[in-house]
A protein has these predicted regions:
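The feature marks the mature, well-folded catalytic cores of soluble enzymes
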Residues: 1-221
Length: 221
């Protein structure tokens, strides 16, 4: 029992495990495969890999699908035209394809979860000036706002825009966190009106909001 990362860790740490049946979406099964079959784990099993089975191959995550590796690689090349990409740390939310995690690894980046996003951003800024955060703009924005980074320092990169993700070069050069235009289709639905409605019905209620929700709902909660 746990979130997808915790479940993957539990399966990977089980030395007797031979198969993992992950009743979830693609990125969850990929994460389990990465953790269970990293080189040191395979060596401990004398070269045997753990097979990961996804019962429904059509099970996907709309947010993970909003950032394709080809789009991210193209964005990186475009960014290189206006800033030094050696000053950018790519960060991908764990809710993303394995190809994006590999991209981060190739470029000195990292994978984060919703619970450690603040620590990961802090780690990144201790090393480089900027961050490219994908695929969830809300998690990136809500986390960065707690670190005194303002919205005007967080340009949103639209992979379908014609040039620089819909930004001018000045916005990119002044940016600290470049946010990918992606979101969770479910968390996106929670709006300030829901918070107001609950507070009217239950004046003393404590409202917990996930950082994948829009900033406006997070701020009110």
């Amino acid at each position: 029992r746990g979130d997808s990362y915790q479940l993957s860790k539990m399966a990977a740490e089980n030395s007797e495990c031979r198969w993992i049946v992950f009743c979830g979406v693609h990125f969850m099964a990929e994460t389990a495969d990465i953790l269970a079959n990293r080189p040191e784990k395979v060596a401990q099993r004398d070269g045997r890999r753990v097979e990961v089975i996804l019962p429904d191959m059509a099970a996907g995550c709309s947010m993970a699908d909003m950032a394709a590796i080809e789009q991210v690689e193209a964005a990186w090349e475009d960014l290189a035209e206006v800033v030094d990409t050696d000053e950018i740390t790519p960060i991908t939310y764990i809710n993303s394809a394995a190809s994006l995690k590999a991209f981060c690894g190739r470029h000195g980046g990292v994978v984060c979860t919703s619970s450690n996003a603040a620590g990961v951003l802090q780690w990144a800024f201790e090393r480089r000036r900027r961050v490219l955060f994908f695929p969830d703009q809300h998690l990136g924005r809500n986390t960065a706002l707690t670190m005194d980074i303002t919205n005007d320092q967080m340009p949103v990169w639209d992979p379908y825009a014609h040039e620089l993700g819909g930004n001018d070069s000045q916005a990119i050069q002044q940016g600290r966190v470049i946010l990918w235009k992606g979101h969770c289709s479910v968390h996106q639905m929670f709006q300030p009106g829901h918070v107001h409605q609950l507070r009217e019905q239950y004046p003393d209620i404590q409202i917990l909001v996930h950082p994948e929700c829009p900033q406006e709902a997070n701020d009110l909660a």
